């Protein structure tokens, strides 16, 4: 309690100083982050007084979700209920000429805000920002802010609970305290009516708050180029709520594209009697794009192959309550891989994501969270239309956005009676499409996997899951050829499969002879379908082969728009309790902490310009096989030439060739020796630069027998924690590389496991990968030995004591 009081006093002092500084300025516009020093109450009462009188509040900082761990623990379900947040705001001085508000970047799913005991406002929908005006409710001195957030199942609000992701409850994004002069700029809407390499124009619509109808207002807009040099400015008198300024004939604009995302800055100043009262800043990019009929995509008049991935908004240990640094790290990793496109699935994401995409040069598919559940009643439709309007209005100015998606798999598994009625769905989809084009005629609309509505939107993605949910991945070219002809503007969103880090096999299951090779459509119900998702081994090297084939096809097809891999990062889902890591969709090419899997380097080899080599695989360092039976080894690289060395001896130099599969021809037959094998791949670029990768493989000639026990070991990590590893061994003390059963870790004394993280080293229950599983353990800090156990149905308990010093 003492710590909480200290935090409150510090928060009051900061806010007091902040407002004194800001209010002493003529230009009294402020925006202050107030994420720190909140209190949280896990109580679903709807009564404010009950919350005010509760004693079991806990101290937290924002962003926050109450589902950070229960989403991925071993118990079925997760908390879908209400919670309360509380913050004390001390404002030393109230200026009667100022308007005060709270801005929430996202609060999931429904929110009510109370200030000093009175309701200030509410919001429906968890993935878009909203502002609550608190001007008439605040007072000089201490102000009590209470916020009730509710993520209970509500059939009237999208997304449907049948969606394949968690709907995290809480204030999951930043919160800001805003103060503006009574006459201020509410919004800037910026368009580029004309763009070419030679000239461009800019149109700025400013929405002005002028409650007292002041007659002496003026608006000044300054445009600066990416280097910060002023290229245009204009001042006009403001006589209405909407003011418009145009800049024509801007010579030789520096275009925004995926390689050089040039951003101009637009700064607007609202003045009253020649005193600046408010300002607003936006970034703008000059670019134009086109989807050719039955053909490729063009950006700024040049063909651009869309090289995309998907992003869910979550992180191990945080759920959706990610910091801006974590958001930015995801996007930088996507860009470093060489991607130029990201589909934000299946909902709008944190403002930091759009900012990063603008700055990094990533095209964006922004999506309304109409994901499954079918069409609803009148209230459902009103909520959905309002949400689309909010999304477009809030994200309009981002040059990275090229598509407003109106939904995904919308008619799957209806929540309402007759919710999969095609006629009703198409009427409503048409209404959404009209809203999107009215609000923004410059961008395209899209949907995925609702075939009956494909003619309504501008761009359509069918379902193609070659090699996973249906058929062989080698049917991919046939699939895209069919859809290029069928759909005027076709893009392929979603392909891939699950992979369990560390699982490898010398002969991955491909489904040959077991499945219908020509299929590619994902069935709604999988119980009667034979596919690799069900019969495959979920090995990293199968997924490497699958992605390698898809990229081999897409990179060599001159008429293809491009594709969008599903998904960049492993993410949690309530629909997959039986997966190798329970409740995790493991289709990511990085794990839930952002650590790359093998597949990440396949994409990087096709897409990235940063020279590298990667030997497949750094998570496959224990192998077995007959003596004098060479194994084919792949190196993924974007270098022009690569040489592979084994035990210091060159196995030859090979030229990378995009027309060859696998690995663009960078494969060698390696005759492994018994014991340690050192492999080095040296890549050489066109300009003579060299890069290398080294891999050590322990190889044995005798195959393991059936597992007879589990063996525990540990190592101390740099962060002071311990990594406890279990391996399955046979009677000859050989690791059983074919053992894939689940094991359960438990810390009995001296610490706690990093459980419920949904990662390869952060799940108390996990299937073994090549006879191995690990978990990170945190010591309790009192220097007592840590006692660990691991068990499953076959092995009733192995124990390990870790001395702590």
Identify the function of each model-found stretch.
Residues 139-142, 205, 209-292:
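Extended acidic/polar, glycine-enriched regions
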Residues 32-34, 39-43, 75, 80-187, ...:
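Accessory beta-strand-rich segments of carbohydrate-active enzymes
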Residues 204-208, 266-269, 633-637, 713-714, ...:
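Beta-strand-rich structural segments
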Residues 234, 279-284, 688-701, 796-805:
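Edge beta-strands of extracellular beta-sandwich domains
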Residues 62-69, 152-155, 164, 182, ...:
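Extended substrate-binding grooves/exosites of carbohydrate-active enzymes
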Residues 24, 28-73, 144-148, 154, ...:
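Accessory carbohydrate-binding/adhesion or oligomerization-edge regions at the termini
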Residues 115, 199-236, 243, 631-653, ...:
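Beta-strand-rich binding/interaction modules
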Residues 134, 246-256, 667-673, 764-781:
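Short, hydrophobic beta-strand segments
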């Amino acid at each position: 309690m003492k710590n909480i009081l200290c935090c409150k006093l510090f928060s009051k002092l900061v806010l007091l100083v902040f407002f004194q500084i800001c209010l002493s300025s003529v230009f009294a516009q402020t925006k202050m982050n107030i994420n720190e020093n909140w209190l949280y109450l896990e109580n679903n009462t709807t009564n404010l007084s009950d919350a005010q009188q509760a004693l079991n509040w806990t101290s937290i900082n924002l962003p926050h979700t109450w589902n950070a761990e229960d989403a991925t623990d071993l118990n079925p379900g997760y908390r879908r209920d209400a919670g309360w947040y509380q913050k004390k705001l001390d404002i030393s001085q109230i200026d009667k000429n100022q308007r005060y508000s709270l801005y929430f970047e996202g609060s999931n799913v429904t929110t009510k805000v109370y200030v000093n005991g009175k309701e200030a406002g509410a919001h429906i929908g968890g993935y878009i920002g909203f502002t609550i005006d608190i001007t008439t409710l605040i007072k000089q001195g201490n102000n009590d802010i209470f916020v009730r957030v509710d993520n209970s199942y509500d059939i009237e609000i999208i997304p449907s609970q049948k969606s394949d992701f968690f709907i995290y409850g809480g204030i999951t994004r930043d919160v800001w305290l805003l103060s503006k002069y009574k006459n201020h700029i509410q919004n800037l809407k910026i368009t580029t009516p004309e763009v070419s390499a030679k000239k461009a124009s800019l149109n700025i619509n400013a929405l002005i708050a002028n409650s007292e109808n002041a007659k002496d207002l003026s608006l000044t807009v300054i445009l600066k180029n990416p280097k910060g040099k002023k290229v245009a400015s204009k001042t006009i008198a403001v006589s209405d709520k909407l003011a418009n300024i145009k800049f024509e004939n801007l010579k030789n604009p520096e275009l925004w594209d995926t390689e050089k995302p040039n951003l101009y800055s637009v700064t607007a100043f609202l003045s009253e009697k020649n005193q600046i009262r408010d300002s607003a800043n936006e970034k703008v990019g000059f670019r134009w794009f086109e989807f050719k009929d039955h053909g490729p995509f063009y950006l700024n008049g040049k063909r651009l192959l869309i090289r995309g991935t998907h992003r869910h908004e979550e992180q191990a240990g945080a759920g959706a309550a990610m910091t801006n640094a974590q958001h930015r790290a995801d996007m930088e990793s996507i860009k470093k891989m060489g991607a130029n496109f990201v589909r934000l699935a299946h909902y709008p994401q944190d403002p930091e994501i759009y900012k990063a995409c603008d700055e990094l040069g990533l095209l964006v598919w922004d999506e309304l969270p109409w994901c499954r559940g079918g069409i609803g009643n009148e209230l459902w439709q009103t909520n959905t239309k309002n949400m689309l309007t909010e999304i477009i209005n809030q994200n309009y100015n981002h040059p990275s956005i090229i598509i407003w998606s109106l939904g995904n798999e919308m008619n799957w598994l209806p929540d309402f009676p007759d919710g999969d009625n095609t006629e009703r769905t198409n009427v409503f989809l048409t209404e959404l499409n009209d809203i999107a084009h009215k609000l923004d005629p410059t961008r395209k609309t899209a949907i995925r996997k609702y075939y009956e509505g494909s003619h309504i939107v501008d761009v359509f993605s069918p379902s193609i899951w070659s090699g996973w949910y249906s058929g062989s991945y080698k049917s991919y070219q046939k699939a895209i050829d069919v859809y290029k002809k069928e759909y005027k503007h076709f893009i392929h969103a979603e392909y891939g499969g699950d992979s369990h880090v560390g699982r490898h096999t010398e002969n991955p299951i491909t489904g040959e002879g077991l499945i219908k090779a020509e299929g590619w459509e994902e069935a709604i119900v999988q119980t009667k379908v034979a596919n690799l998702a069900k019969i495959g081994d979920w090995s990293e090297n199968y997924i490497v082969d699958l992605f390698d084939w898809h990229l081999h096809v897409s990179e060599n097809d001159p008429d293809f728009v491009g594709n969008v891999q599903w998904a960049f990062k492993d993410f949690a889902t309530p629909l997959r309790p039986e997966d190798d890591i329970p409740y995790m969709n493991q289709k990511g090419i990085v794990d839930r902490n952002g650590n790359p899997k093998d597949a990440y380097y396949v994409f990087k080899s096709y897409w990235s310009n940063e020279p590298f080599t990667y030997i497949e695989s750094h998570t496959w360092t224990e192998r077995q096989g007959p003596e004098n039976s060479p194994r084919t080894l792949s190196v993924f690289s974007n270098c022009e030439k690569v040489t592979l060395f084994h035990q210091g001896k060159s196995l030859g130099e090979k030229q990378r060739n995009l027309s060859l599969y696998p690995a663009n021809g960078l494969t060698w037959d390696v005759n492994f020796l018994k014991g340690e094998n050192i492999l080095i791949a040296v890549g050489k670029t066109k300009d003579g630069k060299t890069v290398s990768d080294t891999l050590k493989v322990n190889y044995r000639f005798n195959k393991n027998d059936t597992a007879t026990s589990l063996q525990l070991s540990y190592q101390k990590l740099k962060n002071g924690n311990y990594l406890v590893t279990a391996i399955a061994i046979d009677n000859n003390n050989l690791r059983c590389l074919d053992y894939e059963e689940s094991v359960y870790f438990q810390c009995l004394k001296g610490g706690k496991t990093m459980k419920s993280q949904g990662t390869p080293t952060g799940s108390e229950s996990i299937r073994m990968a090549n006879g191995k599983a690990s978990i990170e353990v945190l010591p309790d800090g009192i220097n007592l030995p840590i006692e660990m156990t691991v068990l499953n149905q076959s092995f009733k308990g192995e124990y390990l004591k870790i001395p702590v010093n």
